[in-house]
Amino acid sequence: ERLIICNGPHMRAYVDTFGWSQLLKSWYVFYFQIPWLPEYLAGLKGARTIAQIFEKTNKRKAAFPPEVIDVYRRNASQSGALRAMINFYRAYRYGWRERERKWRRKLHEPITISTLLIWGDEDEFLEKAIATNTHKYVSDLQIKFIQGASHWVQQERHEEVNNLIEEFVTETARIALEPS
């Protein structure tokens, strides 16, 4: 009935917006296509790379205290965990031709359910224009930018995110209950 997304792009809006700036932000997607090397390097020193990603890209250091970073590192250090994480990006290329025909059709169908897109306006991985271009593909869309938040908006600004979610769910439930 409703959809809530935090800093996750609609793929058509992502493709439409893709230019040099987004390419530079998405370099890691291409790096992850190399077999075994990314997970090997990311796993060195107890998955220190995972900690560095969160430490260097968040805008509110208190959201990622050392004990939270350690949980991410421990989880990433488990057997097969880094490969699974990186395979998310590798899957973009596998089966693309078979899926492309179906996706192309589906990606042009508008999303018609009430949707809330919460977006940190200082995301280092995704251009803000991707969020604004999502209106082309979602007919009932509310975009809420959180100033000074990064890609990790739900960790950095959880109070604001929770309030936005509560307001959205309450409002859309009220509208759904109104007689037509």
Language-model features, listed with the residues they occupy:
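Catalytic active-site module of serine/aspartate enzymes centered on a nucleophile-bearing elbow/loop
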Residues: 140-180
